[in-house]
């Protein structure tokens, strides 16, 4: 018995490796590639850009290296499926939102080649800091940034109805998700800036593949006195259209996520525009123009003080190289290194009806609105518990928003969620099915099936106020091993490190240096 115990202990010690702290600045090139893989695997929200590496550890075994990274990020203005360059994503004089976040990531590399990099899992938390930075007592325009944009699906549908009136080819499209909503109040007007995704629901009413979807920005304008959001005085809307089957992978770095799936990409098709209320109507037919050379937004007009920004007549045309967002999957050990299986049974799901909180209060006080669904998170996959960088910054856990869940490809060509009218607000921002529902699609099964190999989550938390700091994501990833694949040494996935590397955090790179204070620690000078 003692011999057996000793043997088991030796095997355990061989498979377990102490994590080595590493330099955050030196880890930045790899962190950029890891974040690129995360962006390419997402189907909702906005592209993350790296602000800095805030912590970095690694574990080596043979030719494999497992990285444990904490990445401070900022949301760009580019939707995750857009092919535009960052400078071209936002129209001139359009209200933007500053959203910061942190992602805890476990990634594996088998060699120094970028195609051998894979993401094993990640958790992210995000919060808007726009109100804290932009609204002052002297502000001529007050801006409200709503964390629960799904409450404005009606406004998104109204804008899309206007767009479909002027663009008959889009009759079969429906609102997929309200992504951002900003309210601007000043002068005699109140404007709502609503950004949302849409998808084609029929193969019969669109002259392209059914796997077509798009992203729209709509401006709904009201008189300052009105409280009726059902009848805007004017609606301006522009949409981009994408088709994931137009092009295959053109990226130098193929994302590997651990399981075999078709490789898909998408291509931005020509922008169509629609405006009403004494504006010139503009409707462009679908097409795919070549990208312009040397696009520069330096001539973008600045917002005049006291004036509410208006939607421009058209958005900048497509620019930038095609980017692959659909991950490829491969079980084979002959052509590519194997990548880790994500553990099963660890998905946060929506569990409470609208208006009922699963927790008592929010870390930042009340929501902008009074009725939100809240999540029931299992251990290990929610932003609760202890954090590797110290105590919880607020003394509370981040309640409220759940991670993004369902995928555009989880639905058929014309398969809106059953037994609901545009979701009826039941599950906000694509969070998964209630407990007890199958994650696989089938008759009578969950409204929002998770993709069967989703390995990461993004939690949208309430906006931050002056003096508050971002709630960090949970880093207690479940323990799991990489497939053997006849390799002599395989690193065991270790618990996420609980102490920060002495060579961290890295240099804070941002055009918004004032946002560093929302991360709860002072960046190195």
UniProtKB/Swiss-Prot annotation:
Post-translational modification summary for this protein: Proteolytic cleavage produces several HRG fragments which are mostly disulfide-linked and, therefore, not released. Cleavage by plasmin is inhibited in the presence of heparin, zinc ions or in an acidic environment. Cleavage reduces binding of HRG to heparan sulfate, but enhances the ability of HRG to bind and tether plasminogen to the cell surface. On platelet activation, releases a 33 kDa antiangiogenic peptide which encompasses the HRR. Also cleaved in the C-terminal by plasmin. N-glycosylated.
Record's subcellular location: Secreted
Composition bias, Basic residues: 339-404
Tree of life domain: Eukaryota
Main localization category: secreted
Region described as Necessary for endothelial cell focal adhesions and anti-angiogenic activities: spans on this chain: 345-379
One Gene Ontology term of the molecular function aspect: serine-type endopeptidase inhibitor activity
Cofactor(s) of this protein: Zn(2+)
One term under GO cellular component: collagen-containing extracellular matrix
Residues marked Cleavage (site): 439-440
Glycosylation, residue list: 112, 123, 200, 322, 330
Keywords: Angiogenesis, Blood coagulation, Chemotaxis, Cleavage on pair of basic residues, Copper, Disulfide bond, Fibrinolysis, Glycoprotein, Hemostasis, Heparin-binding, Metal-binding, Phosphoprotein, Repeat, Secreted, Signal, Zinc
Gene Ontology terms: biological process: angiogenesis; antimicrobial humoral immune response mediated by antimicrobial peptide; chemotaxis; defense response to fungus; fibrinolysis; negative regulation of angiogenesis; negative regulation of blood vessel endothelial cell migration; negative regulation of cell adhesion
Bias kind Basic and acidic residues: ranges: 293-303
Residues recorded with modification Phosphoserine: 438
Signal peptide start-end: 1-18
Record comment regarding domains: The His-rich (HRR) region contains approximately 12 tandem internal repeats of the 5-residue G[H/P][H/P]PH consensus sequence. HRR binds heparan sulfate and possesses antiangiogenic, antibacterial and antifungal properties through binding Candida cells, and preferentially lysing the ergosterol-containing liposomes at low pH. The tandem repeats also bind divalent metal ions and heme. The cystatin domains can also bind heparan sulfate. Binding is enhanced in the presence of zinc ions.
Record's function text: Plasma glycoprotein that binds a number of ligands such as heme, heparin, heparan sulfate, thrombospondin, plasminogen, and divalent metal ions. Binds heparin and heparin/glycosaminoglycans in a zinc-dependent manner. Binds heparan sulfate on the surface of liver, lung, kidney and heart endothelial cells. Binds to N-sulfated polysaccharide chains on the surface of liver endothelial cells. Inhibits rosette formation.
Protein name, per record: Histidine-rich glycoprotein
Organism, scientific name: Mus musculus
């Amino acid at each position: 018995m003692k011999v057996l115990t000793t043997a088991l202990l030796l095997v355990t010690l061989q498979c377990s490796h102490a994590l080595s702290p590493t330099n955050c600045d030196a880890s930045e090139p790899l962190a950029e590639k890891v974040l690129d893989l995360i962006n390419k695997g997402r189907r909702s929200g906005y592209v993350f850009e790296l602000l800095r590496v805030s912590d970095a550890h690694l574990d080596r075994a043979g030719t494999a290296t497992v990285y444990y990274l904490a990445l401070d990020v900022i949301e760009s203005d580019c939707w995750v499926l857009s092919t535009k360059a960052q400078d071209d994503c936002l129209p001139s004089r359009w209200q933007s939102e500053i959203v910061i976040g942190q992602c805890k990531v476990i990634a594996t590399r088998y060699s120094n080649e970028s195609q051998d990099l894979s993401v094993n899992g990640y958790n992210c938390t995000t919060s808007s800091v726009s109100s804290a930075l932009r609204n002052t007592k002297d502000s001529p325009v007050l801006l409200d940034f709503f964390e629960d944009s799904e409450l404005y699906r009606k406004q998104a549908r109204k804008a899309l109805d206007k767009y479909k009136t002027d663009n008959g080819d889009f009759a079969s499209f429906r609102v997929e998700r309200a992504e951002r909503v900003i309210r601007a109040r000043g002068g005699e007007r109140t404007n709502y800036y609503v950004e949302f995704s849409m998808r084609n629901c029929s193969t019969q009413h669109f002259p392209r593949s059914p796997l077509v979807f798009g992203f729209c920005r709509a401006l709904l304008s009201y008189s300052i006195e009105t409280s009726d959001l059902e009848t805007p005085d004017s609606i301006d809307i522009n949409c981009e259209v994408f088709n994931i089957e137009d092009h295959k992978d053109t990226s130098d770095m193929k994302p590997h996520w651990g399981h075999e799936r078709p490789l898909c990409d998408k291509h931005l098709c020509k922008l169509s525009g629609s405006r009403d209320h004494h504006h010139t109507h503009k409707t462009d037919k679908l097409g795919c123009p070549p990208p312009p050379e040397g696009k520069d937004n330096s001539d973008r007009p600045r917002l005049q003080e006291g004036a509410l920004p208006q939607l421009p007549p058209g958005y900048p045309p497509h620019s930038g190289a095609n980017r692959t967002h659909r991950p490829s999957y491969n079980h084979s050990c002959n052509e590519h290194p194997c990548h880790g299986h994500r553990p099963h049974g660890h998905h946060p799901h929506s569990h409470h009806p609208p208006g009922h909180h699963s927790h008592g209060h929010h870390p930042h006080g009340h929501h902008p609105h009074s009725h939100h669904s809240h999540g029931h998170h299992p251990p290990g996959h929610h932003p609760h518990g202890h954090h590797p960088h110290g105590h919880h910054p607020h003394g509370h856990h981040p309640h409220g928003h759940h991670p993004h869940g369902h995928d555009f490809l989880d639905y058929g060509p014309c398969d809106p969620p059953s037994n609901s009218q545009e979701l009826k607000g039941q599950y906000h921002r694509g969070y998964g099915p209630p407990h007890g529902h199958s994650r696989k699609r089938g008759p009578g099964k969950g409204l929002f099936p998770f993709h069967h190999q989703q390995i990461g989550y993004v939690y949208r938390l309430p906006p931050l106020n002056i003096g508050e700091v971002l709630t960090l994501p949970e880093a207690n990833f479940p323990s799991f091993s990489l497939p053997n694949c006849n390799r002599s040494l395989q690193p065991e996935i270790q618990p996420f490190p609980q102490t920060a590397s002495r060579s961290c955090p890295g240099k804070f790179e941002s055009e918004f240096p004032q946002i560093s204070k929302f991360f709860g620690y002072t960046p190195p000078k």
